């Protein structure tokens, strides 16, 4: 039987259509996925992301452990509360998961990992933490609400105490702070400003209801997916998995190659892949009628006249732009146009950077 988050009852009260999402009963939408999408782009919307896993790591060698575990380098994290995004790789350079890591003190870091990969993540982390005597605490006592949109921070702040307002004032992106019983982070999965707020499970329903009263619109998994795709953000199991290199998933920027003497899991394989070359993740835009869908083939002719083929990893109709967009993994050498096979039709598409909307505006 699928698990329920502490906000399940709130979702049903708000009229949600609930679906099983990787073993969790989650809201797909509350009546109109399109309205929820536009609310986040133009005002403020919120998502229950309590199905994600928060993991606290403690011990004097925690930083050393994370420098080995992750492809990005937590040595960059020097200010308490600062966060970074990273892949957690296997020895062959495949992506076990993508995650966010927060630095609090030298012996206290926090990870936020995906729900679908929870068990394998925890097993992998535990397996490698033992050598470093790192203590692992899974924070199942916390709920997580993402409040996103141009007015999200202002509306959320109406619920904060004076201490919480002071703590978050002027906070830059990718920071988190514990203030009272809330952990408030300037992170998200929509391409908009906002907060991801963790709180004790018993406080979640009251906080959700207060956000509704403050004019924040509940939004479901459907809008979350179209928003993240417009923002060019990867979804685990579609843009990457354990067989896909971060170099082929537009995650090259998350690999800290320097210092050259830092060992991390997957480094040797990545160096070979970088030398040999990999597929690349690109954006596709189709302004003609139709919708680009996952797993459709993408064909093009390279500079040598060879026919090459890739595949759409995520595709949808963009509510913000009014036409279809997609992310696709293709061989190197693609030009500015390609062909996507939709049923028996060959549809022309423009090839772009893998990002379409940022802060509510089209990315040229």
Curated annotation (Swiss-Prot):
Q: What is its EC number?
A: 2.1.2.10
Report a single Gene Ontology molecular function.
Answer: transaminase activity
Q: What is the enzyme's class at the highest EC level?
A: transferase
Catalytic activity reported: N(6)-[(R)-S(8)-aminomethyldihydrolipoyl]-L-lysyl-[protein] + (6S)-5,6,7,8-tetrahydrofolate = N(6)-[(R)-dihydrolipoyl]-L-lysyl-[protein] + (6R)-5,10-methylene-5,6,7,8-tetrahydrofolate + NH4(+)
Matches recorded under SUPFAM superfamilies: Aminomethyltransferase beta-barrel domain (SSF101790), Folate-binding domain (SSF103025)
Any GO BP annotation: glycine decarboxylation via glycine cleavage system
Could you tell me the keywords of this UniProt record? Aminotransferase, Transferase
For this UniProt entry, what's an example GO CC term? glycine cleavage complex
- InterPro entries (UniProt xref): GCS_T, GCS_T_bac, GCST_C, GCV_T_N, GcvT/YgfZ/DmdA, GcvT/YgfZ_C, TrmE/GcvT_dom1
HAMAP family to which the protein is assigned, alphabetical: GcvT
Q: Which NCBIfam families has this protein been placed in?
A: gcvT, PRK00389.1
Q: How does it assemble?
A: The glycine cleavage system is composed of four proteins: P, T, L and H.
The protein's job, in short, is: The glycine cleavage system catalyzes the degradation of glycine.
Family the entry assigns: Belongs to the GcvT family.
What name has this protein been given in UniProt?
Aminomethyltransferase
**Native organism:** Enterobacter sp. (strain 638)
């Amino acid at each position: 039987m699928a698990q329920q988050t502490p906000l399940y009852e709130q979702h049903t009260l708000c009229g949600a259509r609930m679906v099983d999402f990787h073993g969790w009963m989650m809201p797909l939408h509350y009546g109109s996925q399109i309205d929820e999408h536009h609310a986040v782009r133009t005002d403020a919307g919120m998502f229950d992301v309590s199905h994600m896993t928060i993991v606290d790591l403690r011990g004097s060698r925690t930083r050393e452990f994370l420098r080995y575990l992750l492809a990005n380098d937590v040595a960059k994290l020097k200010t308490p509360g600062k966060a970074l995004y990273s892949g957690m790789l296997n020895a062959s350079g495949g992506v076990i998961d993508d995650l966010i890591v927060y630095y609090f003190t030298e012996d206290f870091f926090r990870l936020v990992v995906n729900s679908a990969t929870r068990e394998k993540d925890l097993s992998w982390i535990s397996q490698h933490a033992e050598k470093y005597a790192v203590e692992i605490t899974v924070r199942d006592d916390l709920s997580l609400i993402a409040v996103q949109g141009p007015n999200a921070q202002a509306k959320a702040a109406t619920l904060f105490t004076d201490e919480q307002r002071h703590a978050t004032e002027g906070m830059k992106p990718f920071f988190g702070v514990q203030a009272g019983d809330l952990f408030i982070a300037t992170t998200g999965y929509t391409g908009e400003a906002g907060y991801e707020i963790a709180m004790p499970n018993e406080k979640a329903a009251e906080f959700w209801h207060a956000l509704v009263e403050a004019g924040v619109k509940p939004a479901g998994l459907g809008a979350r997916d179209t928003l993240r795709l417009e923002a060019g953000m990867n979804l685990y199991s579609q843009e990457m998995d354990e067989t896909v290199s971060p170099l082929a998933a537009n995650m090259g920027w998350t690999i800290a190659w320097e210092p050259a003497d830092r060992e991390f899991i997957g480094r040797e394989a990545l160096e070979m892949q970088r030398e040999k070359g990999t597929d690349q993740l690109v954006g596709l835009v189709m302004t003609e009628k139709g919708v680009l869908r996952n797993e459709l083939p993408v064909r093009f002719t390279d500079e040598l006249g060879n026919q090459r083929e890739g595949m759409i990893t995520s595709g949808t109709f963009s509510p913000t732009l009014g036409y279809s967009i997609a992310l696709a993994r293709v061989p190197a050498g693609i030009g500015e146009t390609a062909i996507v096979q939709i049923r028996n039709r060959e549809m022309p598409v423009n090839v772009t950077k893998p990002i379409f909307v940022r802060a509510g505006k089209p990315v040229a």
